[in-house]
Amino acid sequence: MSRVREAFGVEVPLRRLFEGPTVAELARAVETALAAGAPAPDGPIPRAPRTLRAPADTALPLSFAQERLWFLDRLEPGQTLYNLPLVLRLEGELDAAALAAAFGEIARRHEALRTVFAERDGEPVQVVLPAGPWELPAADLSGLPAAAREREADRLAAAEAARPFDLSRGPLLRAVLLRLAPGRHELLLTFHHIVSDGWSMGVLVREMGALYAAALDGRPSPLPELPVQYADFALWQRRWLTGKVLERHTAYWRERLRGLPAETELPADRSRPAVASHRGAEHRFALDAGQVSALEGLARREGTTPFMVLAAATLALLSRLSGRDDLSLGTP
């Protein structure tokens, strides 16, 4: 919908995409908005080219999402709720120096990965650190017996994922290389959510493959320079979402969330603690091919996504267990 707003200069609510999920229906929604003279809140969204960025010595604001995470970190320092761990298994001969060079280039390309969060006059600001060589610590577990090796690899991965970040000092991306055997490695990556998300992790993995191959061959980066950085977006967002524009969006969500219960009471076998311990657990299960096919078929018939079908099923279950029909569901 942001591309629609950028191309046509009109605001089309996101719900229109789900009410009419075809190109023809979306085109009619755009035509209706144009005929009604419904401009975007600030006209078409401008791209934020590098030339519009504040000088490096100017305080860069946080995006609203970043500020929320910064506030939560200040409220409960040392929590690891927003650590994003990722374990990559690498098969075949590995050049650790080339891998470190690839990481260095990724950090150079993506300023968010070398950003820390300072406080100036009581307000958080982004500070982009200079690019430099990337040090890739490594641990060689290949001398351990197979069972002990796997246990130690799991222990190191869990310990790395549970290690807190210092948002004011960084780095907010950590990488550790484990050598399990000749031609077998694990790469432990841990991000803080303030500089990354699930989508960004996929981008990093794809770019790492391209940059590692280039480093092995002694070639420069094959990837084009990025036209914008996350700080560009944060600066644009802060300039746009202010005054009446911010008031309108805030009023909308206050109305949508008005009366929403603060928590969902479930028939648990023990009482809820006064202070959240965050000592939760996860239950993993798999859907067989038939179930996946049925899920995707239902989503197609309803003009929605498999995620929304699963979210609806989860809410239906929570409604049955809690006896409530007004529920909230948080997702990453």
Q: Where is each model-derived feature located?
A:
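Aromatic/hydrophobic pocket-lining residues that form π-stacking "cages" and hydrophobic walls in ligand
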Residues: 295
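DNA breakage-rejoining catalytic core of tyrosine-based enzymes
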Residues: 279-292
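Acyl-group handoff/entry surfaces in thioester-processing enzymes
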Residues: 3, 55-137, 144-240, 244, ...
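Phosphopantetheine-dependent thiolation modules in NRPS/PKS and related acyl-activating systems
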Residues: 1-48, 123-127, 131, 206, ...
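Hydrophobic "lid/gating" helix adjacent to the active-site nucleophile
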Residues: 103-119, 265-267, 298-332
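Glycine-rich loop motifs involved in handling phospho/adenylate chemistry
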Residues: 11-24, 57-62, 91, 192, ...
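Short, solvent-exposed positions on alpha-helices
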Residues: 12, 97, 199-203, 304-308, ...
